[in-house]
Amino acid sequence: MFAIIKTGGKQYKVSEGDIIKVEKIEAEAGDKIEFDQVLMVAGDDVKVGSPVVEGAKVSAEVLDQKKDKKIVIFKFKAKKNYRKKKGHRQPYTLVKIEKIDA
């Protein structure tokens, strides 16, 4: 059985036991969270929502809060000695999917 959930403006295909990396969620490690924006559930039969499946939810546990690898933004203008270097590390949350209720 798998489900497609929406969180942080992105969609993820999940099944029980999966560990996924999602946009930052305000929760501590060990907290239980629920995703109620379930777009599709598939098992023996397929339920597709419009836009979400009514009464469906996915239960998960927060494993960790981390930051992604650094990306470097470098701006310059040719022949003008204009240089700017900036870095960014996007925060994310590691989540373990525990149960899919359809």
UniProtKB/Swiss-Prot annotation:
Pfam families xrefs: Ribosomal_L21p (PF00829)
Keyword Ribosomal protein included in the entry's annotation: yes
Keywords: Ribonucleoprotein, Ribosomal protein, RNA-binding, rRNA-binding
GO BP, sorted A to Z: translation
Record GO terms (molecular function): rRNA binding; structural constituent of ribosome
Cross-referenced InterPro entries: bL21-like, bL21-like_sf, Ribosomal_bL21, Ribosomal_bL21_CS
Highest rank taxon of the organism: Bacteria
An example Gene Ontology CC term for this record: ribonucleoprotein complex
Physiological role: This protein binds to 23S rRNA in the presence of protein L20.
Family assignment from sequence similarity: Belongs to the bacterial ribosomal protein bL21 family.
Assembly: Part of the 50S ribosomal subunit. Contacts protein L20.
PANTHER family reported in the protein's UniProt record: 50S RIBOSOMAL PROTEIN L21 (PTHR21349), LARGE RIBOSOMAL SUBUNIT PROTEIN BL21M (PTHR21349:SF0)
Name under which the protein is recorded: Large ribosomal subunit protein bL21
Organism, scientific name: Finegoldia magna (strain ATCC 29328 / DSM 20472 / WAL 2508)
